[in-house]
């Protein structure tokens, strides 16, 4: 009979198989009432699942992240229940959990309107009040197919048909509504209290533009009303910080239908880009990287050798010329190997660090494109390090230092780190995987860094470390990565002469800090709400006069500041000074210089900031010292 080990170290013995709910009941009525699911030997299960052997059990409630995920998954099914009651002809597709919420894809002849969304949410609340039990039934593939044939649910039937014969299928019954899922789900709708339906959008079935366009209903759910309110507040703030909205206000960039997923950089946006690029260029030079440049268009044969053609050809833009097929590069790595392969390399030459601001194109689905955050044409701060196995840990350690140096310069101090290890399908021996994974984990541990392990999440060709930034709204953005690669150097014939005079294949480390320039600029704009640190601001100073008499003095000051390489503009419009100050403040210009008769006579400048701080009058040299001090801080002064 099972002995149940609890998280606090206590053990309970039962005379017969016991469910998770029965374990919770044995610990107290309060826990039983709050129980949503359970982890049995690390596996998340429904509360009704029997435990037949000795196990470690953790009861999951709404206070746990697993509990929130279970609640959100159950809410997706509740959408299905409500929609089928209100719109019986609707056909249900899939309803997964996503970050901060859930959605359900539905086929229905008529577009759901905002009023429909309100009606669905109202019906969901009515169903929640019924406090009905959610029943689980384990069925065969044949039984599941018959169930959904009876209910005329073609999308469910398609999913069932793709499930392996011996795999367990679970049906979840919400009164008259039945859905299919791996689970777990809440045992009763009393756990489904705090939620809100957010929006409706279009989504192709299976993400394939050749298939049916479905309607996707998004929702969010939380463990308490306080958490829901806080989330909605964050959404409201995120809406204000939307980089597309701010870019329009500041004239940074635009996109248009004639070039989907391609960025039209305006002068001010391009100024930000150039500052970013120059900073990364100078930083990489200090860390002994060689900057290179490789072709945009490369013959198909190279992509076949590298393995990209087989895996990514549908995402590549191709063209033909003189009976040859070419691809616009979706990534830079195969081309970097070509540069490494030029000339004989010795172990004494390693490590070799090749960096490129590589422009890539990927044929992303049009529906996924989103401003700077998801584009088709992007530039990576890409680099590849060719080294020996023994050099991997040292190179990873140096890269970690570089990553944190760069992120601090942009004002990001909260960095989350994940180490992804070997998947089931992989190349390379277990011995080399052991060495590589140990090199990565030892490099992280030597820095005293906290990191999460993601078993089985590495690429087939090697383990990797991912670096994610947390912005001022608590959102997490995966940016940096360093990836060990055993495969590509060998596939593309890279070699060096080792100390024993034998030819060896180098290890290749793929690494990026920003990810892509476009996306990183989008992150910066939203993190700072457009009020970029002074060193990044597209215009650092605007000089403006109070009257026409001050025009020449304004122009002289602008020329002096521009000669010192400060990004400066002059505003000589015949407008009131208050109007001009307000306009440039809304444009997020860090420093405003005002010249009136008094300043013109004294040779000083009146200075104020976009935050409204008034420094009064000072000599121009005093102002440039102030400016230099602010620029030197980079992003370390924080979010204003």
Swiss-Prot record:
Enumerate the catalysed reactions. Answer: tRNA(Thr) + L-threonine + ATP = L-threonyl-tRNA(Thr) + AMP + diphosphate + H(+)
Q: Which cofactor does it need?
A: Zn(2+)
Q: What domain of life does the UniProt record list for this protein's source?
A: Bacteria
| Record key words, sorted | Aminoacyl-tRNA synthetase, ATP-binding, Cytoplasm, Ligase, Metal-binding, Nucleotide-binding, Protein biosynthesis, RNA-binding, tRNA-binding, Zinc
Please verify whether the record's keywords include Membrane: no
Query: Which GO molecular function annotations are given, in alphabetical order?
Result: ATP binding; metal ion binding; threonine-tRNA ligase activity; tRNA binding
Region entry Catalytic, spans = 242-533
The record's section on Pfam families has:
HGTP_anticodon, TGS, tRNA-synt_2b, tRNA_SAD
A GO BP term here is: threonyl-tRNA aminoacylation
Cellular localization per UniProt: Cytoplasm
Entry's SUPFAM superfamilies? Answer: Class II aaRS ABD-related, Class II aaRS and biotin synthetases, TGS-like, ThrRS/AlaRS common domain
**Positions that bind Zn(2+):** 333, 384, 510
Q: Which note does the record give on the cofactor?
A: Binds 1 zinc ion per subunit.
Q: Name one GO cellular component term.
A: cytosol
Asked if the Swiss-Prot or TrEMBL record annotates the protein with the keyword Transmembrane, the reply is no
Q: How does it assemble?
A: Homodimer.
HAMAP family, A to Z: Thr_tRNA_synth
| Record protein name field | Threonine--tRNA ligase
Source organism per entry reads Prochlorococcus marinus (strain MIT 9313)
């Amino acid at each position: 009979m099972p002995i149940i080990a609890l998280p606090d170290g206590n053990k309970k013995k039962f005379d017969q198989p016991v469910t998770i709910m029965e374990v919770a009941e044995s610990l107290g009525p309060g826990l039983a009432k709050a129980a949503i699911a359970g982890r049995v030997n690390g596996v998340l299960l429904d509360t009704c699942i029997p435990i037949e052997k000795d196990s470690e059990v953790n009861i999951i409630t709404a206070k746990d992240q697993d509990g929130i995920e279970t609640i959100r998954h159950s809410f997706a099914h509740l959408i299905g229940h409500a929609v089928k009651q209100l719109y019986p002809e609707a056909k249900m597709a899939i309803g997964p959990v996503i970050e901060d919420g859930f959605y359900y894809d539905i086929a229905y002849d008529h577009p759901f309107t905002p009023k429909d969304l309100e009606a669905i949410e109202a019906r969901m609340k009515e169903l929640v009040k019924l406090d009905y039990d959610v029943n689980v039934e384990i069925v065969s593939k044949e039984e599941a197919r018959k169930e959904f044939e009876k209910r005329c649910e073609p999308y469910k039937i398609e999913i069932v048909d793709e499930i392996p014969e011996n795999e367990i299928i679970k049906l979840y019954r919400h009164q008259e509504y039945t859905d299919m899922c791996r689970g777990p789900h809440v045992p009763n709708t009393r756990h489904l209290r705090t939620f809100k339906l957010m929006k409706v959008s279009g989504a192709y079935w299976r993400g394939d533009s050749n298939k049916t366009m479905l309607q996707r209903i998004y929702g969010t759910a939380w463990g308490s009303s306080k958490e829901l309110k806080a989330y909605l507040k964050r959404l409201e703030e995120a809406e204000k910080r939307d980089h597309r909205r701010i870019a329009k206000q500041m004239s940074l960039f635009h996109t248009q239908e004639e070039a989907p997923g391609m960025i039209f950089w305006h002068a001010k946006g391009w100024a930000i880009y150039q500052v970013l690029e120059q900073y990364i260029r100078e930083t990489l030079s200090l860390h002994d990287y060689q900057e290179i440049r490789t072709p945009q268009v490369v013959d198909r044969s190279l992509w076949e050798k590298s393995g990209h053609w087989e895996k990514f050809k549908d995402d590549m833009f191709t063209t033909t010329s003189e009976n040859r097929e070419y691809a616009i590069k979706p990534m830079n790595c195969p081309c970097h190997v070509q540069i490494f392969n030029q000339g004989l390399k010795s172990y004494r030459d390693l490590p070799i660090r090749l960096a490129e601001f590589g422009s890539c194109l990927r044929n992303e689905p049009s529906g996924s494109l989103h401003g700077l955050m998801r584009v088709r044409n992007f530039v990576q701060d890409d680099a590849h390090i060719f080294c020996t196995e023994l050099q991997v840990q040292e190179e990873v350690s140096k890269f970690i230092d570089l990553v944190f140096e760069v992120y601090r310069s942009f004002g990001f101090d909260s960095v989350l780190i994940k180490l992804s290890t070997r998947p089931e399908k992989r190349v390379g021996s277990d011995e080399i995987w052991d060495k590589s994974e140990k090199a990565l984990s030892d490099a992280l541990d030597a820095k005293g860094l906290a990191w999460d392990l993601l078993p089985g999440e590495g690429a087939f060709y090697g383990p990797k470390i991912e670096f994610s930034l947390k912005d001022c709204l608590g959102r997490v953005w995966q940016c940096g990565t360093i990836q060990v690669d055993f495969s590509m150097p060998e596939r593309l014939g890279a070699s060096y002469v080792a100390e024993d005079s034998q030819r060896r294949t180098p290890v290749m480390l793929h690494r990026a800090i920003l990810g892509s320039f476009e996306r990183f600029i989008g992150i910066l704009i939203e993190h700072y709400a457009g009020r970029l640190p002074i060193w990044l601001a597209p215009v650092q100073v605007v000089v403006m006069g109070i009257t026409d008499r001050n025009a020449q003095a304004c122009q002289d000051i602008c020329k002096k500041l521009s000669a010192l390489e400060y990004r400066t503009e002059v505003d000589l419009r015949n407008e009131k000074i208050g109007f001009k100050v307000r306009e440039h403040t809304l444009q997020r210009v860090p420093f405003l210089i005002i010249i009136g008769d008094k300043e013109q006579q004294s040779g000083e400048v009146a200075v104020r900031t976009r935050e409204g701080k008034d420094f009064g009058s000072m000599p121009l040299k005093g102002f440039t010292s102030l400016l230099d001090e602010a620029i030197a801080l980079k992003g370390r002064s924080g979010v204003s």
